[in-house]
Curated annotation (Swiss-Prot):
General function of this protein: Probably involved in maturation of some viral proteins by processing them preferentially at Ala-Gly-|-Ser/Thr/Lys motifs. Does not seem to be responsible for the cleavage of major core proteins.
Superkingdom as given in the UniProt entry: Viruses
Protein name: Metalloendopeptidase OPG085
Gene: OPG085
GO molecular function: metalloendopeptidase activity; zinc ion binding
Family classification: Belongs to the peptidase M44 family.
Post-translational modification: Undergoes proteolytic processing during the course of infection. May be cleaved into 46 kDa and 22 kDa products (Potential).
InterPro entries: Metalloenz_LuxS/M16, Peptidase_M44
């Protein structure tokens, strides 16, 4: 670890795929509490800008921090990627503090699309921020557009809070001149912020929150000490369904259960977690997980790998101490419980955006202060990989699981999805068959639309057949190479329970690079949040899908795009009753 005079921390991470990865601690949307919710997220969208033909890049805003990364592709170099990312924050050697009203307006529209996307596909319920005075969704809404000048002032104010002690940089290689470049830019920031925000309200403990969730989860407040962090790292590397959350200076260990009986036993204090010592902890974490640790605990003064001997040699005492602290918090009701609830009628609390939620007190009724049993945990295995065809009945459940677990990755092709995970076959089956997970998987049908229409365009099945079997979609043979004949009609209007545009497009020079560039152009116009595309077996032919509240504008953009020599697009209007009758008439897809 290299520490600049103003406390910027720089790490060389030659294993990561990114060229540069930068994080800013104490800079997430928890800072929006008592201000305009969404300022942090809007700032992230305003800062990131790049040439998608030369770079891959992304940014994210979480409760506690913001992060950005950039990777060079094609003719660009690692140095180009580093300079591109730095340019998001500095202009002519000075920290950016000026944002045009037109750009702010476009990105607010994009935020509304992101809100729509996330609430169609996920249940975006941030319980900790809600209990601390924020909302269940804190990413920004369209009504920010009514206060553009105030929003712009807040953005400038937020930039002035960035300080060297907040900055963490991962760089793949520290090339000639790179360190000096960092010193001239991020190294020029004050070691403490020019503007110090008010303290973040403390979340209310001793609560049971009933909300849509795939698992029964108990968030146990523990002290944010080095030993407890090492204990969390030990548990995370060894077991599934264990993680941590932070808000302000508070630290929670999160433990999820698929069995309600085990959850109740843990909550009543009659059972403790069955934690066994493994052979060794390797700290072989992803760069995302490592970055999150440094950002959530900015007081860490060493490289995490400096603690690898301690976490292995002292694991027994670390885990005993952590287990005792967990049990003490359970008994003292220093917890927040998430109980899966899918009833739309049941409601006693609303946030300002009208999301329904039930909040109850976690009482001491039935507490047993001497545990007499232990609960086994799901152990991580070495990485497994499976391939699921679009016709497999487990497709949607696996997609739902990947959306709820960050350590499961999906890759799509014309025939199905490739899934990488570290669960045992028995554990996967237990999750898939659990009552709460099944209800959660079915509670957000919007995710299925992407695969319903992919199956329609990539197979010989009629829309009626697919809708009749929508819980599995229908299998098609990989040996059948489709020949798609585009008819005269380029637009088919339907009614579904979500608003989206999808379809197939073909073009002589059409490739993934041009589609990525197209997606970013649509994002800059505020018309979409993201666009998924899948390369079909037919030459130069892709399937596109995007959730959007601006369906007509997106259709016009795609319909008038010169890269497409042929197209067949479906435009969905949101409604209570589905109507796909237009797809039964003259859509021409031959095999």
């Amino acid at each position: 670890m290299i520490v600049l005079p103003n406390k910027v921390r720089i790490f060389i991470n030659d294993r990561m795929k990114k060229d540069i990865y930068l994080g800013i601690s104490n800079f997430g949307f928890e800072n929006d509490i008592d201000e305009i919710l969404g300022i942090a997220h809007l700032l992230e969208h305003l800062l990131i800008s790049f040439d998608s033909t030369n770079f891959l890049a992304n940014a994210s805003t979480s409760r506690s921090y913001m992060s950005f990364w950039c990777k060079s592709i094609n003719s660009a170099t690692e140095s180009d990627a580093i300079r591109t990312l730095v340019s998001w924050f500095f202009s002519n050697g000075k920290l950016k503090d000026n944002f045009s009203l037109s750009s702010i307006r476009f990105h607010i529209k994009e935020l509304e699309n992101e809100y729509y996307f996330r609430n169609e596909v996920f249940h975006c319920m941030d319980i900790l921020t809600f209990l601390s005075g924020g909302d269940l969704y804190n990413g920004g809404r369209i009504d920010m557009i009514d206060n553009l000048n105030i929003v712009r002032d807040m953005l400038v104010n937020r930039m002035q809070r960035i300080s060297g002690s907040n900055i963490v940089i991962f760089v793949k290689r520290l090339g000639p001149g790179t360190l000096d470049f960092f010193k001239q830019t991020f190294g020029s920031l004050p070691s403490c912020p020019e503007i110090i925000p008010s303290s973040i309200p403390v979340s209310t403990n001793g609560k049971i929150v009933m909300t849509p969730a795939p698992f029964y989860t108990v968030m146990v407040r523990i002290n944010p000490t080095l030993d407890n962090i090492l204990g969390i790292l030990y548990l995370y590397e060894t077991y599934h369904l264990i993680d941590y959350e932070t808000i302000g200076n508070q630290l929670y260990l999160t433990v999820s259960f698929i069995d309600e009986t085990e959850y109740e036993s843990f909550l009543r204090g009659e059972a403790i977690l069955q934690i066994s010592q493994c052979q060794s902890i390797n700290m072989n974490y992803s760069d995302d997980y490592m970055m999150n640790i440094y950002l959530n605990f900015p007081w860490l003064s060493h490289d995490l790998y400096d603690y690898i001997t301690r976490i292995n040699d002292d694991s027994k005492s670390i885990l005993i101490s952590l287990t005792n602290e967990i049990y003490t918090s359970i008994i003292n009701r220093d917890i927040i419980v998430i109980y899966p609830n899918f009833s739309k009628a049941m409601c006693n609390t609303r946030d300002t955006q009208q999301h329904q939620i039930v909040v109850l007190d976690a009482t001491n009724d039935g507490l047993i202060k001497k545990p007499y049993r232990s609960i086994p945990l799901m152990k991580r295995l070495t990485s497994n990989e499976i391939f699921i065809r679009y016709g497999d009945a487990s497709l949607m459940d696996m997609i739902t699981l990947s959306l709820s677990k960050q350590d499961i990755s999906l890759k799509r092709n014309a025939e199905g999805i490739r899934v990488k995970h570290s669960f045992s076959a028995d554990d996967i089956q237990a999750i898939m068959e659990s009552d709460s997970f099944l209800k959660y998987s079915r509670s957000k049908p919007a995710a299925m639309y992407q695969y319903i229409f992919l199956s329609f365009f990539a197979s010989g099945n009629s829309i009626d057949d697919i809708l009749t079997n929508r819980d599995s979609t229908l299998e098609f043979s990989k040996r059948t190479k489709s020949k798609i004949l585009f008819g005269r009609n380029t637009r088919y209007d339907i009614t579904a329970k979500s608003s989206f545009v999808c379809g197939i497009v073909r073009g002589k020079s059409l490739d993934k690079t041009s589609l990525v560039e197209m997606m970013w152009d649509l994002k800059k116009k505020g018309l979409i949040y993201s666009m998924e595309f899948t390369n079909l077996l037919s030459k130069n032919t892709f399937y596109l899908f995007t959730f959007t509240i601006y369906t007509d504008e997106v259709y016009d953009y795609l319909n008038n795009n010169k890269l497409f020599s042929a197209k067949c697009l479906v435009v969905s209007t949101k409604g209570d009753v589905e109507n796909f009758s237009s797809l039964k008439k003259d859509v021409v897809i031959r095999f």
